[in-house]
Swiss-Prot record:
Residues annotated as catalytic: 213 (nucleophile)
Major site of localization recorded for this protein: plastid
GO function terms (MF aspect): disordered domain specific binding; glyceraldehyde-3-phosphate dehydrogenase (NAD+) (phosphorylating) activity; glyceraldehyde-3-phosphate dehydrogenase (NADP+) (phosphorylating) activity; identical protein binding; mRNA binding; NAD binding; NADP binding; protein homodimerization activity
Name recorded for this polypeptide: Glyceraldehyde-3-phosphate dehydrogenase GAPA1, chloroplastic
Pfam families named in the record: Gp_dh_C, Gp_dh_N
Protein localization: Plastid, Chloroplast membrane; Plastid, Chloroplast stroma
Binding partners and assembly: Tetramer of either four A chains (GAPDH 2) or two A and two B chains (GAPDH 1).
Name of encoding gene: GAPA1
Pathway: Carbohydrate biosynthesis; Calvin cycle
Superkingdom: Eukaryota
EC number: 1.2.1.13
Family statement: Belongs to the glyceraldehyde-3-phosphate dehydrogenase family.
InterPro entries: GlycerAld/Erythrose_P_DH, GlycerAld_3-P_DH_AS, GlycerAld_3-P_DH_cat, GlycerAld_3-P_DH_NAD(P)-bd, Glyceraldehyde-3-P_DH_1, NAD(P)-bd_dom_sf
Top EC group: oxidoreductase
Amino acid sequence: MASVTFSVPKGFTEFSGLRSSSASLPFGKKLSSDEFVSIVSFQTSAMGSSGGYRKGVTEAKLKVAINGFGRIGRNFLRCWHGRKDSPLDIIAINDTGGVKQASHLLKYDSTLGIFDADVKPSGETAISVDGKIIQVVSNRNPSLLPWKELGIDIVIEGTGVFVDREGAGKHIEAGAKKVIITAPGKGDIPTYVVGVNADAYSHDEPIISNASCTTNCLAPFVKVLDQKFGIIKGTMTTTHSYTGDQRLLDASHRDLRRARAAALNIVPTSTGAAKAVALVLPNLKGKLNGIALRVPTPNVSVVDLVVQVSKKTFAEEVNAAFRDSAEKELKGILDVCDEPLVSVDFRCSDFSTTIDSSLTMVMGDDMVKVIAWYDNEWGYSQRVVDLADIVANNWK
């Protein structure tokens, strides 16, 4: 059976979503191709604390549409393209940029590099990816999209706009059966983080959220800390790469700090990531809070968490707990790095979170500090594919 490297390629030209790179970080793991196909299939029963659901049988591929072909939309397609035997079939993209832009920006990416696939326009209404035709439509109103005509099963909602039931529900009105929001959902939309609470997924829910990239980084190792040592309270700071929601040069924005030039400043701003952990780990409600510092890097972010714990411990014991989880229930989700690396080294990491073991600290015997890296685009998009796989494998 073929083996794929579940790690980060080092050379810039290799940051392209390659399906067969032999380059890897010192802490990289090799998983079988079956394990890489989906985090669902690497250990379905191990995810979460309740023993998990059993993977269902998908007889035919589910038809998938991507709404919004921006950073997450394009990363999602590359991640999906790198999977073998996926139960998903991307057949449509809704984006206002049109076919030429969709094709060009998928092929050439300033962060990921050149996509190792034959990507080109196919007429005026579709793009071709290695010969696969994907229809491109353009409508800002999701309720008017041709999801019924195309037989769409799952919509990947990647605009960051339609994040409540009313907005995301427009895809259902248009004929789609399920919607996965690639952002924190608003209201009572169920939130799932793969490796944390995905075993609780209910097929009865037409709209679900994959949470934020930072919550996907934070929740897995917070789960370990709480289970092993008992979290009393804590605070988090994510030093986060700038995003499209900031201004390139000083310009109007509802957040006066985000109105300032993203590439020239450290920009303090809000994040709901810490509080959102309670959506997937309810016992931590009210125990965590945090802020974000947006910095002049285009990708990769790092979480700094400080918590007070009820069980006395020391740094080596904390790291040992992470290593144990990385080999068991959080395999493929959490990793531990022992090398003195920097942010660029984690670009295109498939993991949701990578603990920087040398930076783990314990003050006294009950205040724990943990530093964790994450690729806020690529790693997050891998989890979106995994969550879509969960939906597919539980299809009724």
